[in-house]
């Protein structure tokens, strides 16, 4: 059998004439004590809370719920597991302060960075600061596009080194900067990653 899931409102409504086996409804996002949360209901009444923000994480949770149902895992066990579950490096909340949120995410291309920053904008942050770099010996086109995305969607961007491999880190930053320069976004270059993170605080 094939079972399906849907995030109501993700594409307006479910496909005409079709009804998903499980639908996330009344989806809300919140911030509490330096963490971001996703909150939703299924079957009109079952309530779920995730420590991972964003529609894409709600979709992932629905897939997990369906698999758990297939194996007849108790709903309370599923709820508890989803509420506690995090994925290292994927919208990972790092608790530092109650006054701001610090997330680590493996956004390695323009699309993933755009989705991430768009999701974070949905939380209506007072200020959105992004620290990122691009890996060496990989597509150079990606670098400028990521710089442009950060410049458009973040309030402030800190460009830094990220595994330069055999390339000069400063030349990689030049490529990223070529994209961000065409936006109105404020930014700074700090090649040393540890210093870049320290600067953000």
Description of each model-found segment:
Residues 32, 44-156, 178:
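Nucleotide phosphate-binding/pyrophosphate-handling subdomain across enzymes
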């Amino acid at each position: 059998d094939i079972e399906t899931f849907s995030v109501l409102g993700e594409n307006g409504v479910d496909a005409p004439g079709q009804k998903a086996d499980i639908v996330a409804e009344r989806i809300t996002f919140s911030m509490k004590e330096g963490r971001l949360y996703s909150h939703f209901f299924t079957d009109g009444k079952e309530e779920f809370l995730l420590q991972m923000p964003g529609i894409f994480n709600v979709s992932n949770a629905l897939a997990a719920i369906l698999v758990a149902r297939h194996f007849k895992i108790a709903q309370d066990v599923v709820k508890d597991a989803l509420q506690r579950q995090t994925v290292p490096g994927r919208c990972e909340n790092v608790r530092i302060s109650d006054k701001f949120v610090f997330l680590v995410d493996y956004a390695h291309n323009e699309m993933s960075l755009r989705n991430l920053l768009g999701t974070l904008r949905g939380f209506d942050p007072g200020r959105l600061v992004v620290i990122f770099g691009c890996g060496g010996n990989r597509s150079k086109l990606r670098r400028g596009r990521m710089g442009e995305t950060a410049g458009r969607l973040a309030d402030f961007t800190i460009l830094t080194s990220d595994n330069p491999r055999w390339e000069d880190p400063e030349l990689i930053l030049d490529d990223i900067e070529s994209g961000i320069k065409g936006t109105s976004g404020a930014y700074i270059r700090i090649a040393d990653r540890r210093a870049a993170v320290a600067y953000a605080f």
